[in-house]
Structure formats: C-alpha cells, structure tokens
C-alpha cells in the first residue's frame, strides 16, 4: 500500500532543515524500493518549507513508524 507523508516545517526552521538535509537524504536512500517519491515544498520565497514523501508500507502503523525515524522528524523540523 502507498502512503503519502506530508510535512510542514516549523516557522523559521530553514537552517535546521539545511543542517539535517544530508542525514534526511541518506535515510530516504536507505528506504530502497520502499521509497516511491520525495521532494520539498517551496514557499513564496522559493525556499523549502516542507516535504512530501511517498512510501510503500504494509500498514498505516508501519508508515507512521517509518516517518517517525526520518531525521527531519527526529530533529523536530
């Protein structure tokens, strides 16, 4: 089953996003074939302000568990 994970960054958190980006990308790469699509949302200033991640998982609970392990989530972004 496919699940879309929609993430809105907290206000004024661009630097946290940039500092955590390499770990986030490594995490996504580690999902292998389970990752179907991922990309940032851009604000009116063309700077990232959130993310969309589409993954394949066996259940909603499994998808939530995967989302909770994302470095962006762990950093409180």
Please describe what each predicted stretch is.
Residues 1-77:
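Conserved, structured core segments of small domains
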């Amino acid at each position: 089953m496919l699940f879309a994970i929609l993430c809105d960054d907290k206000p004024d958190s661009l630097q946290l996003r940039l500092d955590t980006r390499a770990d986030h990308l490594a995490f996504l790469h580690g999902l292998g074939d389970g990752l179907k699509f991922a990309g940032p949302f851009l604000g009116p200033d063309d700077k990232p302000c959130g993310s969309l991640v589409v993954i394949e998982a066996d259940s909603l609970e499994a998808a939530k568990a995967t989302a909770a392990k994302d470095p962006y989530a762990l950093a409180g972004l």
